[in-house]
Amino acid sequence: MEEIRFCPEHGFYRGEKCRCGAEGELILPKEKVEKLGKFISGVLRHFPDKFGLNMDENGWVNLESLARVVKRRYKWANIWLIKALVYSDEKQRYELKGDKIRARYGHSIDVKLSDFPEAKEDVLYYGTSEEEAHRMLEIGIKPVNQRYVHLSTTIEKSKEVASIRTDTPIVLEIDAKKAREDGIRIIKANDLIALAEEIPAKYIKRQIVFNQYSSS
């Protein structure tokens, strides 16, 4: 987890130096970035009701209400720091719109996300282990502990996700175009992630096998 800094020209960013080379003002040190990120992710993805937040069917909550919840946990937190977390997040975990905020993906609670755009990619990818890949080739890809199946727009991202759990990642190539034509709803959460309620096995085109020593 990297610190958050502010560049007068480019705004909030993660790390010691901005892309322009400037060493901006320190906004949040690493340990506070981690605490704030974990707490907000938990609230927006898993337990808004626990903190009395009213969440609509698309995952939106009021930003000021969230800030009050966060401040009860961390006295140093405020809306400005929440915005710094969102705008500097290269993984695009969150979305701000006016006076509302939501998590873009990772939900375990029932959210519809009906205002997300349809994913336009013809091919998408799902990273997994060898054992799980065999099962998915038979029964399809279903969500585990999350509301949606999380697909990647690139092979590299899928491999990265799978490599967290196994030394021999498998990437399943999904015929997203055919799935959409057949009525499977696939939505775009951000530049790297698409979501679907499930992917039946017939849309898995092939599997790509890697090992811990492979570079591609």
UniProtKB/Swiss-Prot annotation:
Keywords: NAD, Transferase
Gene Ontology MF term list: NAD+ poly-ADP-ribosyltransferase activity; tRNA 2'-phosphotransferase activity
GO biological process assignments: tRNA splicing, via endonucleolytic cleavage and ligation
Listed EC numbers: 2.7.1.-
Top-level EC class: transferase
Pfam families: PTS_2-RNA
Repressor in keyword set: no
Keyword field contains Transferase: yes
Function: Removes the 2'-phosphate from RNA via an intermediate in which the phosphate is ADP-ribosylated by NAD followed by a presumed transesterification to release the RNA and generate ADP-ribose 1''-2''-cyclic phosphate (APPR>P). May function as an ADP-ribosylase.
Protein family per UniProt: Belongs to the KptA/TPT1 family.
Protein name per Swiss-Prot or TrEMBL: Probable RNA 2'-phosphotransferase 1
Phylogenetic classification of the source organism: Archaea, Methanobacteriati, Methanobacteriota, Archaeoglobi, Archaeoglobales
Gene behind this protein: kptA1
